[in-house]
């Protein structure tokens, strides 16, 4: 397996857990990150170095990342689109520029990554996993633009899976649910919201993604899988 994983810039993040899980399963993994985004957020960046740094706000960045991954690994057969622009606000705070930033980085870049991956694909069996959110399940207060952008990916899965099925490329999406990546959950009691008494961990999502990318998941395509540990929203 030759896999490209985007959004790998923090050791405590889901992207890093996915890359490590795929490597443990024997895959060759090429990672993408964009440190300036994390550095500008409350959680900050760490010293993790991805194989390539690229800003998906730039229209040509997806093509450059796929080319770089193929140059190092050879033809790619697995793509995990994990990157995301985060840090949203309420409806009253939205601007056109704010909305565009989320759509460009979370939707446009993701679709272009899928396109570039499919164009270079040469194998007889491939897998793509998009990372979405719980926006299709319930309201996400203060995350309007983020929720819309992630919801778009969930909606796109069925169409992408259909278009790529004749080439034996499966497409699925994973909603990892509330996951402890070091920020944002301290003021909510997991004992009340989570039946198992804890928040999700990055490896919880990584195990599901790795399964979807493996031969064991070969009969699953066009699905949005909610891996939330029974999260109670209300």
Go through each PLM region and give its residues:
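Residue(s) in the substrate-gating loop at a strand-loop-helix junction
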Residues: 133
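Canonical Rossmann dinucleotide-binding motif of NAD(H)/NADP(H)-dependent dehydrogenases/reductases
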Residues: 1-30
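Short, small/polar-rich loop/turn modules that mediate ligand/substrate recognition or access, typified
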Residues: 125, 165, 170, 220-222
């Amino acid at each position: 397996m030759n896999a490209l994983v985007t959004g790998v810039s923090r050791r405590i993040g889901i992207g890093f857990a996915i890359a490590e899980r795929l490597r443990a399963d024997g895959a060759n993994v090429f990672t993408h990150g964009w440190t300036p985004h994390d550095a500008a957020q409350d959680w900050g960046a760490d010293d993790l170095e991805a194989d390539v740094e690229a800003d998906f706000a730039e229209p040509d960045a997806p093509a450059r990342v796929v080319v770089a991954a193929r140059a190092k690994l050879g033809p790619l057969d697995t793509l995990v689109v994990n990157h995301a622009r985060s840090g949203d606000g309420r409806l009253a705070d939205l601007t056109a520029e704010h909305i565009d930033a989320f759509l460009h980085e979370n939707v446009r870049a993701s679709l272009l990554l899928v396109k570039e991956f499919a164009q270079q694909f040469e194998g007889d069996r491939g897998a793509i996993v998009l990372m979405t959110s719980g926006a299709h399940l319930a309201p996400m207060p203060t995350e309007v633009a983020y929720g819309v952008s992630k919801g778009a990916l969930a909606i796109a899965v069925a169409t992408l899976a259909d278009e790529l099925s004749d080439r034996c490329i499966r497409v699925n999406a994973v909603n990892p649910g509330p996951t402890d990546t070091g920020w944002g959950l301290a003021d909510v009691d997991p004992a009340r919201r989570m039946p198992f008494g804890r928040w999700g961990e990055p490896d919880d999502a990584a195990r599901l993604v790795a399964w979807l990318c493996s031969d064991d998941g070969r009969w699953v395509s066009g699905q949005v899988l909610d891996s939330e540990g029974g999260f109670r929203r209300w």
